[in-house]
């Protein structure tokens, strides 16, 4: 079982197998099968390497130095942290839910009108862990827990891409690609905000730079310079303003950097950030070039009209300027949201202070920027990303009492779909227990299939 879970939770291998299967179904020559499979796996490994480099390097370091510079105390939403705690007690339940959920995803894609195959393995694992934790509180154990969790997981794996699909088609210019990332509600929300500015704002990618700064149209250069400025300013506040320049190196914050002057460190980290984004974009281009053609084989043979739903960086190459703007403005929204929560805490009721985590605001905020830009251009991008930053600050705060009641105090999920699922299902599980909760999960899963059977389909013109 552990071997199977390792495969299903490793996106590169999972998507490589999907590509292999699709190419074989199309009866492609052996050389094409090998080439397509290997390039798909390599593409995901490149994407993962870029994401990991950002998360463990520049993004993590920026979060540490930012929190110290501005003396912030609170909860930083982090999917990996809370999942690691959950797996300590619910590892087997998580594994079974994940396997059943992926089967349920295929069933819904085949027999409902939500033709999406969710391929973001690590998010599937995270959602499985959360469902295992919450449903356990609803007095479900063993097979009833696994089936209930698997059915809800399969349902979320088609609903989230379906929410994003109308805007996804505008971003990519094709209906062959879905979007698979459990921040879907947040991206849909940003897109709806963007629509308020439709036909009133030019795209972020149409921003005209003066000739002397035309180099900013190069994504790598623009991101590198912007993040270098951010790192220099924040590190200056931490080292010079707060510590009084007692030590010009960065050793007080990062022990391995004992000989590095803070200015050199800040510049290096800012440019490293741009390098990580460049790696991600390179991986995305490799994946898209191979997975979409290969997936047609599966769509034609098993799930007609199925779309592969792929992780959020898949949209980054379509609007690089929106990626940077979305991240920065979403992060600003997170800071504003923190002060709003602080005000609520003092004036009304005690509520968790949610610190703006750099990782969710980069990946989710950047994606929200791309979605909002597709619907409302530059103005839509700025407003949609800012409100998205507020959203992923307030939702985890609302979800905190649920997680606290499950003995996961001081931890919460970061992305919108996790928070919404936790809030809704967590509250249901507090009141509906055992067989009743199992029945609720089964009915929810069957609704898209029932709708497909009883409701007339639109006739093609």
Report residues per predicted region.
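Hydrophobic alpha-helical segments embedded in the membrane of multi-pass proteins
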Residues: 95-104, 122-133, 150-155, 331, ...
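Signature of multi-pass transmembrane helix bundles
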Residues: 1-51, 96, 100, 104-298, ...
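Membrane-helix interface and helix-disruption motif detector
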Residues: 82-90, 116-117, 138-146, 216, ...
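Helix-loop-helix junctions within the multi-pass membrane cores of secondary transporters/permeases
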Residues: 16-21, 34, 59, 63-84, ...
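Helix-loop-helix module between adjacent transmembrane segments
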Residues: 87-99, 115, 321-324
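Juxtamembrane "helix exit" motif at the C-terminal ends of alpha-helical transmembrane segments
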Residues: 227-246, 334-349, 365, 395
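Transmembrane alpha-helix boundary signature
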Residues: 52-65, 111-115
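Membrane-proximal extracellular juxtamembrane segment immediately upstream
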Residues: 51-55, 349-352, 372, 381, ...
